[in-house]
């Protein structure tokens, strides 16, 4: 046991970032409520960062903060602010200023090392039954394969890929451990939310031409992409 009552340690977390393009509280509140209604289990009471790089003009920071509280979200801080006077306003309002990480400087090449032995093959968790609303299935360190339908309100999580050979109506979160090479495959994509390594789409962000169709999702340049599943 430590002899001190607290310890400060560095850590990192994946947070959703809300990019604002309108400063009116009622407009923001309505938009937030619509998003939360689409995926309440994922967004309700979620911690979020607000990026204000797309806003012009004055902002009532206290009202903005209250808008997020009223919507059931926890505002961690503000990002995307480059103006010193604006930063001072944000600080006076009692809000934290966050700075996005910058790419690290190139490092000198290290001498070649002995190759590590190949990693063990990724395991697979197989689910042969329908996944019903309220169920949550997690495949740690493995792919997840579901050979039946997934109901709205159900949640699939895998550190590897997710395959659904049926209608996918719930939430599918692949690459949950941070694997950006993970993919999602569905023979009928109708999901409430899809996510790969923390990058997600809500249902209204899935391109209409792929909704209720066989589709494959993956990351390209850090963004979600979708293509037909042939």
UniProtKB/Swiss-Prot annotation:
One GO process term, biological-process aspect: regulation of cell septum assembly
InterPro entries: CAP/MinC_C, MinC, MinC_C_sf, MinC_N, Septum_form_inhib_MinC_C
Keyword line: Cell cycle, Cell division, Septation
Pfam families linked to this entry: MinC_C, MinC_N
NCBIfam families per UniProt: minC
Entry-linked PANTHER family: SEPTUM SITE-DETERMINING PROTEIN MINC (PTHR34108:SF1)
Quaternary context: Interacts with MinD and FtsZ.
Chain's role: Cell division inhibitor that blocks the formation of polar Z ring septums. Rapidly oscillates between the poles of the cell to destabilize FtsZ filaments that have formed before they mature into polar Z rings. Prevents FtsZ polymerization.
Family the entry assigns: Belongs to the MinC family.
Name the record gives this protein: Probable septum site-determining protein MinC
């Amino acid at each position: 046991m430590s002899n001190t009552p607290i310890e400060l340690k560095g850590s990192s977390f994946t947070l959703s970032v809300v990019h604002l393009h309108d400063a009116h509280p009622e407009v923001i509140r309505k938009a937030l409520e619509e998003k939360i209604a689409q995926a309440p289990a994922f967004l309700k009471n979620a911690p979020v960062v607000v990026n204000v790089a797309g806003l012009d003009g004055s902002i009532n920071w206290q009202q903005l903060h209250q808008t997020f509280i009223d919507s059931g979200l926890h505002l961690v801080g503000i990002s995307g602010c480059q103006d010193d006077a604006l930063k001072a306003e944000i600080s006076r309002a009692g809000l934290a200023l966050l700075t996005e990480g910058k790419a690290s400087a190139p490092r000198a090449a290290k001498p070649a090392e002995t190759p590590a032995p190949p990693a063990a093959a990724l395991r697979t968790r197989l689910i042969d039954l329908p996944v019903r609303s309220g169920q949550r299935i997690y495949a740690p360190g493995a792919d997840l394969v579901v050979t039946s339908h997934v109901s709205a309100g159900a949640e699939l999580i895998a550190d590897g890929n997710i395959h659904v050979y049926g209608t996918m109506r719930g939430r599918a979160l692949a690459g949950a451990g941070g694997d950006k090479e993970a993919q999602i495959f569905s023979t009928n994509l109708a999901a409430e939310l899809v996510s790969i390594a923390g990058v997600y789409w809500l249902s209204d962000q899935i391109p209409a031409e792929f909704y209720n169709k066989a589709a494959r999702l993956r990351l390209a340049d850090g963004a979600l992409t979708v293509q037909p599943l042939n």
